[in-house]
A protein has these predicted regions:
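ATP-dependent adenylation/nucleotidyltransferase module used to activate substrates
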Residues: 2-157, 189
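Mid-to-C-terminal catalytic subdomains of enzymes
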Residues: 148-193
Length: 193
């Protein structure tokens, strides 16, 4: 509310962390609507385009949360469907696109410059990380052009062991699950999904 932003943006991978992040946004709005009432939530969130009478949580969520599934050739159908189902359940505005072209472009440019062919056997971490990092400019663009806060999706367990990807799942302005461990995240996800 104090940020004067229009809501939140999340790169929704269909995994536990991004799912937990959007569930927390949903739960925050659900509880606010129960506690304050629809009219007060609409007023506090400055949702002038919404009718105050009979405004559902689905309508509010569609206006304050954008989720994006950014698939690569290594993404599974399971994660894509999971992201889609969760986005439908919480009523976020949801988009999907492929990052294959951008990943290929980066790898090709570096291969050409270094005269080296990169492969999954020898360069697994670098190839995984380039996929995570190439998603960042796209989701930042969506956040910036909609005056929204980008929520990062890195959890405490990953940070503790150095598993999070800088400029990948750590990319964002606020990290709602940074202090939550993976075990709790999975329990919370199982409760909702």
């Amino acid at each position: 509310i104090k940020s004067k932003c229009n809501g939140f943006t999340v790169s929704l991978s269909g995994g536990a962390d991004s799912s937990c992040t959007v569930i927390l946004v949903y739960e925050m709005i659900r509880r606010a609507m129960l506690e304050l009432g629809e009219k007060e939530v609409i007023k506090k969130l400055n949702l002038k385009n919404l009718q105050e009478d009979n405004c559902s949580i689905n309508t509010v969520m569609k206006n304050i949360l954008i989720t994006v599934y950014q698939k690569s050739k290594n993404s599974s159908l399971d994660t894509e469907l999971s992201a889609k189902k969760l986005a439908q359940f919480i009523s976020s505005t949801h988009f999907k696109w492929s990052i294959n072209e951008e990943v290929k472009s980066i790898i090709d440019k570096i291969s050409k410059t270094t005269n080296k062919k990169y492969n999954w056997k020898n360069d697994n971490i670098a190839l995984q990380n380039v996929q995570a990092r190439v998603r960042s400019p796209f989701i930042w663009f969506i956040a910036n052009t909609n005056n929204m806060i980008l929520l990062s999706t890195s959890n405490r367990s990953e940070s503790a062991v150095g598993y999070s990807t800088m400029d990948g799942d750590t990319s964002g302005s606020v990290s709602p699950i940074a202090g939550i461990d993976k075990v709790f995240i999975k329990k919370l996800d199982n409760f909702y999904v």
